[in-house]
Regions:
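Extracellular protease catalytic domains of secreted zymogens
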Residues: 1-351
Length: 351
């Protein structure tokens, strides 16, 4: 099952959040594996793609339960790294294939607050009066979502995470290098390519609502978002179910178990998606650990917004220091979760 709906935990309220969690729990008990898009709003779900978020850090209540697999979004990093020729064919193959191999990834993020984007435009920082967000950079909160559950229960006010807000407790299976000791459910669990064109990458798809599509995909429309990533992950799960001959239910315990074997206590250099410009992850990797970039977005106001000077700030876990919400790191992180996946290796490794 794949779900692409999403609204903030605080706005949904405790009753609806509990209802969603109970539905997913029932589904998993009946053998269903539930995948939910983490969202396309960075870590500012309560502003839902607003140009200048003002409500601080928040995530979708549709994907923050302990009974679903939250799917975040990445972008390919070849354009930023200047290595596109290494990974793409000059022309499509007879079957319209274009990629030569797996390529480096980074979190999907269209905002001026994104460090790779601001760096590529020649700015030392995305924030401050001399930063990219205050000098023509795109004010956008469109990015792969992720962050800690912070208002699944209790009540906030005015779209803010305050009052009696509290997150879902951390599931026993959510253990991995990089997982914070915050006591709450962290999202996403995994990620997949979700870019919508900023760096030249997006999904080509056939929209038949206006008629049939031509035979050449180069004439088809393109788009991105975690609403692509989530159903594709559900497709991966269908391969596993077919291989094992039986439904699997909630797969998160197995995902984190496999990731722990691969990453260990210090992360895995061999499976680092973003290790070097010229290197590729080992062909035996099941997960690719994304360690380049962030899913940070621009913001206004004084709630989780670092604004040292200028008029536009960047989403931060600190108002007084630059602590981007959120960066990448070894193993798990709020920008991409465990990371992305080698599907064939995952199917073959599934217990």
């Amino acid at each position: 099952v794949s779900i692409s709906y999403g609204t903030g935990e605080e706005g949904d309220g405790q009753t609806e959040n509990q209802f969603i969690s109970s539905l997913y729990q029932q589904a998993s008990s009946e053998g269903m594996s539930v995948f939910v898009s983490s969202g396309d709003e960075g870590s500012a779900e309560n502003d839902h793609r607003g140009a200048n978020p003002t409500h601080g850090i928040s995530i979708s209540g549709w994907q923050s339960t302990a009974f679903d697999t939250s799917v975040g979004g990445t972008d390919f990093a070849d354009t930023f790294l200047g290595t596109s020729k290494k990974y793409w064919n000059k022309k499509n193959t007879a079957n319209y294939g274009s990629a030569k191999s797996y390529m480096p990834e980074m979190p999907w993020d269209d905002s001026c607050a994104n460090v790779p984007l601001s760096t590529s435009k020649g700015f030392a920082t995305p924030y401050g009066s001399a930063g990219y967000c205050n000098n023509g950079g795109p004010h956008s909160s469109v990015a792969g979502s992720g962050g800690p559950s912070n208002c699944a229960t209790g009540t906030g006010t005015g779209g803010l995470i305050n009052g009696t807000c509290a997150g879902w407790p951390k599931p026993s299976w959510q253990k991995l290098v990089g997982v914070p000791n915050d006591g709450v459910r962290d999202t996403p669990d995994v990620s997949l390519m979700a870019a919508n064109g900023l760096w030249g990458h997006y999904y080509v798809f056939c929209d038949t609502s206006g008629g049939t599509c031509g035979s050449d995909p180069s004439t088809w429309p393109g788009a991105g978002g975690t609403s692509f990533a989530s159903p594709i992950w559900a497709g991966f799960m269908a391969l596993i179910v077919h291989a094992k001959g039986e439904p699997q239910g909630l797969i998160n315990p197995t995902l984190y178990s496999i990731a722990n074997e691969e990453y260990g206590k210090k992360g895995s250099k061999a499976c680092n998606s973003s290790n070097k410009k010229t290197s590729k992850p080992n062909t035996t990797c099941i997960f690719y650990d994304v360690t380049l970039g962030d899913n940070d977005v621009n913001c206004l106001g004084t709630v989780n917004c670092y604004l040292p000077s200028g008029t536009a700030g960047v989403l931060s876990t600190s108002d007084s220091d630059y602590e981007p919400a959120y960066g990448t790191g070894k193993g798990y992180d709020f920008a991409t979760g465990i990371g992305t996946v080698n599907v064939a290796n995952l199917v073959n490794a599934w217990p």
